[in-house]
Amino acid sequence: MPIRFTKHALEKFSVLKSYGVSVSRTQIAQIIRTPEIIDCRRLPLYIAQGELDKRRVLRVVYKQKGATIVVITFCPGLKSHYEKDNT
């Protein structure tokens, strides 16, 4: 399935990098394809979550548009905050 990024999502790469957080398109694609947790409570939006590093997870907000996945945004978060959220 092809993955497309919104303008906001593309800008997010450089915003996070300015804070010292490096995220790649490959990492995002991997989390979407094999998430540790997926939150479907905000359909049609999905939130896929996967490990970013030892302390943090990466949460990816996306929607399905036909055969394409559209990444809207993504953000790192502390594992300690999200491990309690068993969605």
Model-found features: residue ranges?
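Ribonuclease/tRNase effector modules and their secretory precursors
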Residues: 1-87
